[in-house]
Amino acid sequence: MSNIIKQLEQEQMKQDVPSFRPGDTVEVKVWVVEGSKKRLQAFEGVVIAIRNRGLHSAFTVRKISNGEGVERVFQTHSPVVDSISVKRRGAVRKAKLYYLRERTGKAARIKERLN
């Protein structure tokens, strides 16, 4: 029984997901439906958390919009997510960057990873 579930989940997983880590700046393009129109909307920010659970994997992206912090959780293999592109690699030493919520301005900067 579980082999059938694993096979179905494997078929539904996206193959074109780039590798990224917490601290990386990513741009996620998401399909948004407004009335009868369907368009792509970009959301660019820093990955502060990743949850790896196969088909149910998710990641949290944080950005500052008009001086207000905005966080959004995306399901990695969701059909709503069109594409994910890594803009900048960040060097951090923790898996969850929740401490960035309290920091603003230059204190919230992340060093760039060189490799």
Curated annotation (Swiss-Prot):
Alphabetical list of Gene3D superfamilies matching this protein: 2.30.30.790
A Pfam family the protein falls into: Ribosomal_L19
One annotated GO biological process: cytoplasmic translation
Cellular-component GO terms for this entry: cytoplasm; cytosol; cytosolic large ribosomal subunit
Keyword annotations of the record: Ribonucleoprotein, Ribosomal protein, RNA-binding, rRNA-binding
Keyword Ribosomal protein found: yes
Transmembrane regions listed in the UniProt entry: none
Superkingdom of origin: Bacteria
Keyword Flavoprotein: no
Swiss-Prot/TrEMBL induction comment: Part of the rpsP-rimM-trmD-rplS operon.
One Gene Ontology term of the molecular function aspect: structural constituent of ribosome
Annotated function: This protein is located at the 30S-50S ribosomal subunit interface and may play a role in the structure and function of the aminoacyl-tRNA binding site. In the 70S ribosome it has been modeled to make two contacts with the 16S rRNA of the 30S subunit forming part of bridges B6 and B8. In the 3.5 A resolved structures L14 and L19 interact and together make contact with the 16S rRNA. The protein conformation is quite different between the 50S and 70S structures, which may be necessary for translocation.
Family statement: Belongs to the bacterial ribosomal protein bL19 family.
Subunit structure: Part of the 50S ribosomal subunit. Contacts L14. Forms two bridges to the 30S subunit in the 70S ribosome, contacting the 16S rRNA. In pre-50S ribosomal subunits interacts with RsfS, which may inhibit association with the 30S subunit.
Name the UniProt record assigns to this protein: Large ribosomal subunit protein bL19
Organism phylogeny: Bacteria, Pseudomonadati, Pseudomonadota, Gammaproteobacteria, Enterobacterales
Name of the gene: rplS
